């Protein structure tokens, strides 16, 4: 009789969850995920375009400037920006689950402690950038290009520090599901960046130095705008009582999760840069590198778009796990996967339909366009796989699976993908196609790993782990009372303050 009663209770709970829109695939959850993903697309694109616009304006100076800025952008992404993004990925877990558990003081502790850690790390990155020309000489780059690239990298250091503060602040709002401040600040920074970059590069004759400085000013403007929103947010009251002990304990939790998070993100990011370097070793390196660059750019633009769904999935999964709602967390996962699949179909069908003409967006050379057309089917498969991979990576960050993701990235890309790509490219004579097939297989392996982990996960157990993580060392933390906070009032408080000022 006891077993029967338990079964009845379980069925009643599932029926109630279904009525509340918490079935394994619910329209309500899809609306939540998509409503957050839409503005995050604008945020991601706005931040992505800052470096692209500076590169385009520098490219119109002369061919030498374009080469130097392109190489510097690639190396600074590998040695700096990618690491910051990777470390900040730990906050997707920590801040999101803390908000779900209503431990609001911990959100501020995690945010501030991560800022301190990342700022200290930035100084070591800056030293590397000061000697960028020496690093480029190791790869036998042209001395003049190396000097210009080093000069651009040095003047990009202020942008690195601004970007370092921007990432935790973005996670601070994202973990609460507040997207309006992110949308306004990133769009405002982009609108400022375009004329300001033009002014520095062309009118004031700063050249590539102006292109680098404009990125720094734009990042710091974004940080300033987000700080204003944060200063007048409801959660700011919970952050005023933070002490040294709380910051140290939060710092330990952050570092423990930040290292595997950086491993998970950076190893995948770096593999594409290695792909580009390998294409330069081919006989017709100019053609091969051009086509691989076109594919990488197309894939990067698509990833910026689909990663917004992953960010939304990360937020909803972490919030629900922190709140102990394991069924809602699973519903968020399934809804995000469904939306990612829809986006994958639309993108791949569109790209394949225009496979004979999309290359003209990047080049007027018929040989380049013809080669791009040949590699498009492989690129479409890669984009299809990466659409689901971006979503499941977001689920992994929200669930705290960064360590699994790090090992998956290491094994799939560096033990399988890159060696296989080299074999297909140079031994089987498939050239650039072979390189891209290797990366495609690596992405597929990583996707399978994430899919298996997600499918066989006990979400009720994950919810328990999340709450254990959040409430770790909670007795020492002041200001973690379960205060009822309505996140929608954050923006309203700021607007009221502005209205009173005016």
UniProtKB/Swiss-Prot annotation:
Tell me its family.
Belongs to the multi antimicrobial extrusion (MATE) (TC 2.A.66.1) family.
Q: Which InterPro entries match?
A: MATE_euk, MATE_fam
GO cellular component annotations of the record: membrane
Q: Name one Pfam family in it.
A: MatE
The stretch of residues making up the signal peptide is none
**Molecular function in Gene Ontology:** antiporter activity; xenobiotic transmembrane transporter activity
Per the UniProt entry, what is one GO biological process?
A: xenobiotic detoxification by transmembrane export across the plasma membrane
Q: Tell me the membrane topology, using the record's own terms.
A: Multi-pass membrane protein
Q: Which NCBIfam families match?
A: matE
Taxonomic source organism: Arabidopsis thaliana (Mouse-ear cress)
Compartment(s) where it occurs, according to its Swiss-Prot or TrEMBL record: Membrane
- Transmembrane portions of the chain: 36-56, 68-88, 112-132, 143-163, 182-202, 208-228, 262-282, 291-311, 331-351, 375-395, 408-428, 436-456
Native organism taxonomy: Eukaryota, Viridiplantae, Streptophyta, Embryophyta, Tracheophyta
Q: Which domain of life is it from?
A: Eukaryota
Name recorded for this polypeptide: Protein DETOXIFICATION 7
Major location category of this protein: membrane
Q: Does the keyword Protease apply?
A: no
Give UniProt keywords alphabetically: Membrane, Transmembrane, Transmembrane helix, Transport
């Amino acid at each position: 009789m006891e077993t029967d009663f338990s079964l009845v209770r379980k069925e009643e709970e599932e029926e109630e969850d279904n009525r509340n829109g918490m079935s394994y695939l619910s329209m309500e959850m899809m609306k939540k995920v998509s409503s957050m993903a839409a503005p995050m697309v604008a945020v991601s694109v706005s931040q992505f375009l800052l470096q692209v616009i500076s590169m385009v304006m520098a490219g119109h100076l002369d061919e030498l400037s374009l080469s130097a800025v392109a190489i510097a952008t690639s190396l600074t992404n590998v040695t700096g920006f990618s690491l910051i993004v990777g470390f900040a990925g730990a906050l997707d877990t920590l801040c999101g689950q803390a908000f779900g558990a209503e431990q609001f003081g911990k959100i501020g502790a995690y945010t501030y402690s991560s800022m301190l850690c990342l700022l200290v790390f930035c100084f070591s990155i800056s030293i590397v950038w000061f000697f960028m020309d020496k690093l480029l000489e190791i790869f036998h780059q042209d001395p003049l290009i190396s000097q210009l690239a080093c000069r651009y990298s040095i003047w990009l250091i202020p942008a690195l520090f601004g970007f370092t503060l921007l990432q935790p602040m973005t996670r601070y709002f994202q973990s609460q599901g507040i997207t309006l401040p992110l949308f306004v600040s990133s769009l405002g920074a982009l609108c400022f960046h375009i004329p300001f970059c033009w002014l520095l590069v062309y009118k004031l004759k700063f050249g590539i130095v102006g292109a680098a400085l404009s990125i720094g000013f734009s990042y710091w403007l974004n940080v300033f705008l987000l700080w204003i929103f944060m200063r007048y947010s409801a959660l700011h009251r919970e952050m005023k009582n933070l002490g040294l002990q709380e910051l140290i304990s939060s710092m330990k939790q952050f570092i423990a999760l930040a290292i595997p998070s950086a491993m998970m993100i950076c190893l995948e990011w770096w593999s594409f840069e290695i792909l580009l370097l390998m294409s330069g070793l081919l006989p017709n390196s100019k053609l091969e590198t051009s086509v691989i660059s076109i594919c990488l750019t197309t894939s990067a633009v698509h990833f910026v778009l689909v990663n917004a769904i992953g960010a939304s999935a990360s937020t909803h999964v972490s919030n629900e796990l922190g709140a102990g709602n394991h069924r809602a967390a699973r519903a968020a996962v399934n809804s995000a996967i469904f939306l990612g699949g829809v986006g994958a179909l639309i993108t791949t069908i569109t790209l394949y339909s225009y496979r004979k003409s999309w290359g003209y967006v990047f080049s007027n050379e018929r040989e380049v366009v013809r080669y791009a057309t040949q590699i498009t089917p492989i690129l479409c498969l890669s984009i299809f796989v990466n659409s689901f991979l971006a979503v499941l990576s977001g689920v992994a960050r929200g669930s705290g699976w960064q360590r699994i993701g790090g090992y998956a990235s290491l094994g799939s890309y560096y033990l399988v993908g890159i060696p296989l790509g080299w074999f297909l490219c140079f031994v089987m004579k498939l050239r650039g196609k072979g390189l891209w097939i290797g990366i495609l297989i690596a992405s597929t392996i990583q996707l399978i790993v994430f899919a298996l982990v997600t499918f066989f996960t006990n979400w009720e157990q994950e919810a328990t782990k999340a709450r254990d993580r959040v409430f770790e060392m909670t007795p020492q933390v002041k200001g973690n009372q379960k205060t009822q906070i309505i996140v929608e009032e954050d923006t309203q408080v700021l607007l009221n303050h502005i209205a009173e000022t005016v």
